[in-house]
Design a protein with these regions (language model features):
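Short N-terminal binding/cap micro-motifs at the start of the first secondary-structure element
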Residues: 26-31
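Short catalytic helix/loop segments, enriched in acidic residues and glycine
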Residues: 35-45
Length: 199
């Protein structure tokens, strides 16, 4: 933040440190717009954001040799929040081992490192767009308002073993393991319960 911006800040205004990881593909475009939103929030409310950008995904591989550079991870640890774009490029992902690809080496690692286990995905249909919905108008009722709560750090993402093996006669067998602990199930259930109480 420059000195002029610091002078304009009201006394006692809270500043939040944000790690902005634009990543690959549409990530940089989405990140530019997200930062514009944060700047608009600063103008409207007594809040300030110190935003530091860092490489992740193929941008990280190109800059530092890995999808989640050490400097990016350290920035995330020192920040109040992480603003994440997207990672992975279909034309480049197949060129490296699965474990080193951006989704696994960057996104899943960040989720695990910071216990980012709950993804809240709202589904809403404004009445102005009702005609675009595949559901007939009589089935839409008063509109659509759904919240999907998705668990991110257990299940098949991190379950082992996970492999494909030859079993002879031109056949292969794929093994993928779904693993959840009691506490992982309880915590995602409680996020869902709390969200339901607010609806």
């Amino acid at each position: 933040m420059n000195r002029a911006a610091q002078k304009r800040r009201p006394f006692g205004m809270k500043t939040y440190n944000i790690a902005a990881l634009a990543g690959d593909g549409i990530g940089p475009e989405v990140m530019r717009e997200a930062i514009k939103v944060l700047r608009a929030v600063e103008k409207k409310f007594a809040i300030s954001f110190s935003i530091t950008e860092a490489a992740v995904g193929w941008a990280g591989i190109d800059a530092a040799g890995k999808a989640l550079p050490d400097t990016t991870l350290e920035l995330c640890k020192k920040s109040d929040a992480i603003l994440f774009g997207s990672v992975g490029l279909p034309d480049r992902d197949p060129t490296i081992p699965k474990e080193e690809r951006p989704e696994r080496a960057a996104l899943l690692r960040i989720r695990k490192e910071f216990s980012l286990f709950a993804n809240l995905r709202p589904v809403q249909l404004p009445k102005a767009l009702a005609h675009s919905c595949p559901l007939s108008l009589d089935r839409q009722g008063n509109g659509i308002d759904i919240l999907v709560v998705r668990e991110l750090t257990g299940g098949m993402y991190f379950g082992q073993p996970k492999k494909t093996e030859d079993i002879g006669n031109g056949q292969q067998r794929a093994i993928d393991t779904m693993v959840y602990t009691t506490s992982e199930i309880e915590r995602i259930a409680h996020v869902s319960f709390r969200a339901a109480q607010l609806r």
